[in-house]
Design a protein with these regions (language model features):
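Short beta-strands and strand-loop turn motifs
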Residues: 79-85, 110-119, 146, 195-197
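Conserved post-catalytic alpha-helical subdomain immediately downstream of the catalytic base
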Residues: 204, 220-276
Length: 276
């Protein structure tokens, strides 16, 4: 896990929590004066959740190229995953992302990107499309929801309309999802795997999930999860990404098994409080 944190007791408590979950933290660097925060008002029934970000001037928001020794970090690595949030906080942060991507590319790592578009974070004078389109060109694997692909790559969503596990609309829309994947690969020629995380929010606590993968000219899809009593959806996308990367590494010849594993991880996260 690589980030930049202020050198204080709160940051060290965060690092200890990451270590307790089995994450390596040797790539974390210290600098800056404050830890970025967000405040979440949880939704219920027909009331949506609301988030307030307090990240301006944080240690990560003031990250610049040259602050992280990427060559040392990548020396024994095979995969580099990054999030669009890292590029959303500042131009300097976006430049640091490009630095990391260029080095990872030069060193032969597999590169994956979670588009992670957060409208409230893009406040430094550039649009997400302007910044992210050049950066995603380094991607072998791309993750995202349909609105994120639309915001960054300009691809019109298909729409996920399923309301329960028996809904046949998902099956009828699969040819359109295949065309969606083809368009992503046209816009990002390096990309070998396009993942779409699909969610239909019936209410704030009732969500229907599925996922599709477009790769090697074919579309694979999961079944549908109908989560009627959701506990906390925050982090469910990260759980999908983490599960998918694990699945691709563990089951290199079985993308469908990896896809099912990833969606199961995401569905399970909806039943657990907390962001990770």
């Amino acid at each position: 896990f690589v980030t930049r944190l202020p050198d204080n007791a709160v940051s060290r408590a965060c690092i200890n929590s990451l270590r307790a979950s089995g994450l390596g933290t040797d790539g974390i660097v210290f600098g800056g004066k404050r830890l970025g925060l967000y405040y979440l008002e949880c939704g219920a029934a027909f009331r949506n959740s609301n988030v307030v970000y307090d990240r301006e001037g944080s240690s990560f928001a003031t990250l610049r190229p040259g602050m992280i020794d990427w060559e040392t970090i990548f020396a024994d690595a095979g995969w580099f995953h990054w999030s669009g949030i890292a590029a959303a906080l500042s131009q300097e942060g976006a430049d640091a992302c490009r630095e990391a991507l260029e080095i990872a590319d030069r060193m032969g790592l597999t590169i994956s990107c979670d588009l992670n578009f957060r409208k409230k974070l893009w406040n430094y004078g550039c649009t997400a499309a302007e910044v992210m389109q050049p950066l995603v060109q380094y991607s072998d694997v791309i993750f995202g929801a349909e609105p994120e692909y639309q915001e960054i790559l300009g691809i019109q969503p298909v729409g996920f309309r399923a309301v329960d596990t028996a809904d046949v609309s998902f099956e009828s829309d699969l040819p359109s999802f295949e065309k969606f994947g083809q368009e992503v690969e046209r816009l990002v020629p390096r990309c070998q795997k396009v993942f779409l995380e699909l969610r239909n929010s019936i209410t704030s606590n009732h969500n229907v999930l599925a996922a599709v993968l477009y790769s090697d000219g074919t579309l694979k899809h999961t079944g549908i999860y109908d989560i009627e009593h959701e506990t906390d959806r925050v982090g469910a996308g990260d759980a999908f990404v983490g599960g998918m990367i694990y699945g691709l590494i563990t089951y290199p010849d079985d993308d469908r098994k990896a896809l099912d594993f990833a969606l199961a991880a995401s569905a399970l996260k909806n039943t657990v409080y907390g962001d990770f």
